[in-house]
């Protein structure tokens, strides 16, 4: 049998370990989000003796979590934004959000963007906040003819632009990311570390697949002014080459694909083929992300897991085990029942091709 592992953590304020926290800790919860949803930290401490000092709002806390006897994993720096004290028995709850998210992100602006690339827009906004832009190569040179940012914050505008292109945008560790989601790669196209989860005792899971969302492709129409007629472009899954020998699991890999010919048609007619192709690709990726979801609570927490990592799970139904998964959200909790990690996973987006009809 495995030796009993003890959770461990360290909380630093302005670079120094906070003393006396370990004995008072009732719970520590850390949520890693994707997109413009700030990562959250919640710490509840026992104050039955009334000796705890209330930390100042705005204090910066750096958190490391893991297991005793193993190197701890740093999970970022957070700014205290809410403090609650309740009882009896008296306890103090400190809430903090990722230091990467600042109030000035919410300032509404008036900007008109004309004939610019995605790279120009993202870089200009990153520069305004002293952030480093990290943009997926395939998105950099996409041209934006015209876009109005009217009474809209930079982050809201970036999110809207990302949705239009099938991308996601967020701030992590001083970088403004504008990347393709669900591919398991960073902005430079390099693979993120992958994970492997083997089902073990105490783990809980939930798997969901919606057939109505399992489309095989997306079709968009555009107006060819040279010929004065509508043309269509289709985006669909790139079929892997057929294996020479039929394997028993080969059909199971298609379980999440959707019925043949189940094509989503975009109502809008686009002004050119490139715009139609881009809209179809963005919609296809959005549909793929929503088709299947899998959540799992690991009885033995894994601090090294974070959103956009991709990997595999084993010990579940073959349809689940045969799928490549991407972490959409990770929540780490240390309390009196130990250290657990709750993951929300999405199916990794398969490769696709665009065809002009």
Where are these regions (language model features)?
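Interface-prone segments of viral and bacterial extracellular assemblies
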Residues: 1-7, 11-13, 72, 96, ...
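An acidic/polar, Gly/Ser/Thr-rich interaction patch typically located in mid-to-C-terminal regions
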Residues: 28-53, 202-357
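Conserved "cap/hinge" positions at secondary-structure junctions
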Residues: 65-67, 180, 309, 315
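N-terminal export/assembly leaders
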Residues: 101-109, 121-148
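Short, compositionally biased
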Residues: 77-86, 111, 183-185, 324-337
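Assembly/oligomerization scaffold segments
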Residues: 1-103
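Short beta-strand-centered interaction patches in the first periplasmic/extracellular domains
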Residues: 91, 97-100, 137-206, 212
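Polar, S/T/G-rich
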Residues: 116-123, 127, 151-163, 215, ...
